[in-house]
Amino acid sequence: MTALTTGSEAWWQAKNGPERERHQENYRVTFWWRDPAGTQKTSTVKRVWLYVTGVTDHHQNARPQSLERVPDTDVWQWQGKFSPEWRGSYCFIPSDNENDFADAVFEGEQPDRMALREGWRKLLPHAVSDPLNPQSWRGGRGHAVSALEMPEAPVQPGWNHPDTPYNKPVCIDWHSARLKNRRRVWIFTTGDESPERPLAVLLDGQFWAESMPVWPALASLTHEGKLPPAVYVLIDVIDTAHRSRELPCNPDFWLAVQEELLPQVKSMAPFSDRADHTVVAGQSFGGLSSLYAGLNWPQRFGCILSQSGSYWWPHRGAQQDGLLIEQLKAGEKTARGLRIVLEAGRNEPLILRANQAILAELHTQQPVFWRQVDGGHDALCWRGGLTQGLMTLWQPLIQ
């Protein structure tokens, strides 16, 4: 077989995303990006920054990585090492600048964390997904991303059946008197209508409704008998400002959900009032919010699914404990009686440490289902943890 010339049309036609090869205990992965403007003679592109969640991002405090051009071609490439269980999202950020980061990012033993974060914050709105990779979507921060999964990455229940038929969700407008705002809420049901159906409240509902629709996965697992017939309520965050205000330990948000939203939903799709049949699920600030709901209203929210919960809040980067950790230590709150699934990624150090700290406090009061995943602060990891967590929390309801 004749070797294809790097950068030729036939060479590009043979590519369908990153390429991996086994290398001792790990995999060596090569990323490719095709410069639409051609070679260095015709293109103004100086850098193609690679943002791999949990590897080259600000959560790892890693120095920014750029693909390098293969001279006299339209080919840019970068190679890195990944564990066999790794799963995560990535994107490219082509730039006409030689450097888009402050000097402090490249000086000293460690990049300056704030300068690194600020550099990525400015670049990410310009991110593009991998045109060679069919598995692409718009991430939670609004920019395009693509998927990379190693051969031994954990199974993600339900997500391998994207063509499963499902009942169309109903999208309503919730006008909140208490919060003085309005937002979309999706109501999704599986199985036959019954007042005994369990309830799941999913935070960041717009993501699970639109960016990475969860409906086929839930329908598939219900059809297989791995989830009970249920009512799912997906709550939109409105925007970043509302999310940052309403999700971190905000009593008004949860009072509005209980006093206003749930009665409205119940009139359309009856569900059980039992706390031990009710799940609150969230990621990042949503993970923090879900445990906050359970600790403060255990009579209503008895099952908590927290993924990459921001338990450092409100002290980002500080050495002191977050609010919920402090309250548990002081005995101001108790987790007794709650069923809790707690999950965090190895590649999100600040979040992982905060989760380990709150796990230590929760464990003294209550058994906790703890899961540490080989990934970062990443919806591609969360989607499997979401369905697995629902299966775990509702296991007693499966006949």
Regions from the PLM with identified roles:
Residues 2, 24-85, 95-160:
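Aromatic-rich carbohydrate-binding modules that target alpha-glucans
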Residues 186-189, 195-206:
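Short beta-strand element of the alpha/beta-hydrolase
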Residues 201-268:
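Cap/lid segment of the alpha/beta-hydrolase catalytic domain
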Residues 205, 237, 305-314, 346:
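Active-site nucleophile loop of the alpha/beta-hydrolase fold
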Residues 228-231, 299-311:
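A conserved short beta-strand
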Residues 271-284, 304:
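Alpha/beta-hydrolase fold nucleophile elbow
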Residues 287-298:
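Short glycine-enriched nucleophile-adjacent loop
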Residues 312-381:
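The feature captures the conserved acid-bearing segment of alpha/beta-hydrolase catalytic domains
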